[in-house]
């Protein structure tokens, strides 16, 4: 077991959810808990959000859906964003998972199993309005409009789409996607709709429709929501080095003075990127401490020379993620996004849930 601890504040996640629900007013708000709840624990987060009346949970795959269903029981809706495939259709039916159908082939597969089971099978349809990743194309949507038998045997519960650049509020592409979505929905007047991801919630009520699907904002990856995550690591080694001493693999850092160097037990095997070598920072008692030398598989070194001697000791905790170094701030150092920082949190870390 790692000496490092990831602390997840479920109360903060619940408060973020309630903030988003308040913004959405009359629309339902679900939760994206794919990738194990963005690395924070899909089961624990979902159970906490159920307490706030969340009933729609979005996962990527059938495997994620089965794990969540086993933990949550039948009283929630679990939606599988990657859709249905021949190999997992029966599993989706057995575990009451609802696929988001992304192309005509998936519709055909789901119809086939509807006939096999001789009953309606629930589904969402995903219309591609411009992200050009998953979703039915304009040609496929036109086929559905002109031939409703293509949906025979299916209980179509929602039509969804996904915004490509919702975090840029003034980007005109958001409105382009909204208008395309509305144009398609005219042909399905009795079907509920969902468009807003986290960023979409903040674009205004026109984007909310019947159901919003936040992920990032629940986990503090938005200026208006709070970070629920703290990652701490203890000092496990201390050494006094003289001027011109080399630190770590490839000797990429050389001391410019007599220095006190501390070692922390985490590295790239724990999802702490090697790109933080010689440019990241951690915090000890609110003071910034630089990472020096290469990030290695299991260890990083930090320069604690400028800390008061009373704060430099074995077992002293350094904050890697927290109030002083949020996932978004850390991500900006190495040119990535906070999502990647969270989903990369290693399995060796101890998880502690509070709130």
UniProtKB/Swiss-Prot annotation:
The keyword Isomerase applies. Its cofactor is pyridoxal 5'-phosphate. Its EC number is 5.1.1.1. PROSITE patterns: ALANINE_RACEMASE. GO terms for cellular component: cytosol. The keyword Isomerase applies. It catalyses: L-alanine = D-alanine. The active site is at 34 (proton acceptor), 249 (proton acceptor). Keywords: Isomerase, Pyridoxal phosphate. One of its GO terms (molecular function) is pyridoxal phosphate binding. The modification N6-(pyridoxal phosphate)lysine is found at residue 34. Pathway: Amino-acid biosynthesis; D-alanine biosynthesis; D-alanine from L-alanine: step 1/1. Coiled coil: none annotated. CDD domains: PLPDE_III_AR. Substrate binds at residues 133, 297. One of its GO terms (biological process) is D-alanine biosynthetic process. Gene3D superfamilies: Alanine racemase (3.20.20.10), Lyase, Ornithine Decarboxylase, Chain A, domain 1 (2.40.37.10). PANTHER family: ALANINE RACEMASE, ALANINE RACEMASE, CATABOLIC-RELATED. Catalyzes the interconversion of L-alanine and D-alanine. May also act on other amino acids. Belongs to the alanine racemase family. HAMAP family: Ala_racemase. This is Alanine racemase. It comes from Rickettsia conorii (strain ATCC VR-613 / Malish 7). The lineage of its organism: Bacteria, Pseudomonadati, Pseudomonadota, Alphaproteobacteria, Rickettsiales.
């Amino acid at each position: 077991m790692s000496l490092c601890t990831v602390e997840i504040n479920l109360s903060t996640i619940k408060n973020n959810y309630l903030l988003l629900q308040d913004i959405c007013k009359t629309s339902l708000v679900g939760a994206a808990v794919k990738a194990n709840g963005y690395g924070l624990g899909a089961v624990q987060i979902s159970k906490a959000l159920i307490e706030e009346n969340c009933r729609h949970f979005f996962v990527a795959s059938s495997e994620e859906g089965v794990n969540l269903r086993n933990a949550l029981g039948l009283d929630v809706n679990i939606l599988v964003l990657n859709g249905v495939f021949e190999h997992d259709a029966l599993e989706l039916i057995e575990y009451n998972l609802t696929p988001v159908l992304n192309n005509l082939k998936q519709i055909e597969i789901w119809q086939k199993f509807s006939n096999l089971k001789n009953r309606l099978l629930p589904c969402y349809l995903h219309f591609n309005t411009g992200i050009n990743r998953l979703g039915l194309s304009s040609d496929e949507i036109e086929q559905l409009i002109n031939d409703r038998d293509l949906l025979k045997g299916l209980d179509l519960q929602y039509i969804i789409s996904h915004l490509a650049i919702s975090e840029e509020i003034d980007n005109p592409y958001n409105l382009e996607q909204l208008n395309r979505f509305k144009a398609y929905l005219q042909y399905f007047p009795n079907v509920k709709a969902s468009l807003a991801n986290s960023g979409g919630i903040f674009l205004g009520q026109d984007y909310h429709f019947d159901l919003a699907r936040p992920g990032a904002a629940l986990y503090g990856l938005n200026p208006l929501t709070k970070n629920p995550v703290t990652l701490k690591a203890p000092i496990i080694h201390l050494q006094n080095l003289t001027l011109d001493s080399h630190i770590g693999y490839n000797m990429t850092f050389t001391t410019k003075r007599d220095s006190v160097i501390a070692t922390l037990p985490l590295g790239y095997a724990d999802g702490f990127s090697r790109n933080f070598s010689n440019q990241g920072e951690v915090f000890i008692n609110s003071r910034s401490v630089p990472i020096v030398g290469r990030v290695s598989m299991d260890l990083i070194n930090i320069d604690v020379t400028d800390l008061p001697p009373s704060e430099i000791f074995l077992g002293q905790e350094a904050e890697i993620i927290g109030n002083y170094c949020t996932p978004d701030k850390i991500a900006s150092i190495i040119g990535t996004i906070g999502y990647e920082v969270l989903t990369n949190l290693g399995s060796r870390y101890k998880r502690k849930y509070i709130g």
